[in-house]
């Protein structure tokens, strides 16, 4: 890319942040990296909105099912109507939050165990088996 500023001409130099035009794979990976960084910056907000929308859709479908079921002639206990339709939609976002926290804890413990094992293998005392 060449730009004109006044009477002088400037051309950006080759560096690690400037993709070179010769290799298409490098440009593609550079662009994908930028898109991934943008997505990961906004991901918690998007996932929170999606969780709330799913819970609201579940609640509205539950209310519709309750209205249809109340107009029928069969007698059912109130628990049948309230169990999933109301509490399911209320607890769904909380359940997803708990799963995400458990994944973070599990990944932390897994990485910690690998680090301990690696440091033991690198720096630990190597004992050889001696015949009795």
Curated annotation (Swiss-Prot):
Q: How does it sit in the membrane?
A: Multi-pass membrane protein
Record protein name field: Putative membrane-spanning 4-domains subfamily A member 4E
Q: Which GO terms describe its cellular component?
A: membrane
Localization of this protein: Membrane
Native species: Homo sapiens
Mainly localized where? membrane
Superkingdom of the source species: Eukaryota
Which InterPro entries does this chain map to?
A: CD20-like
| Segments crossing the lipid bilayer | 52-72, 76-96
Sequence similarity? Belongs to the MS4A family.
Mind listing the UniProt keywords for this protein, alphabetically? Answer: Membrane, Receptor, Transmembrane, Transmembrane helix
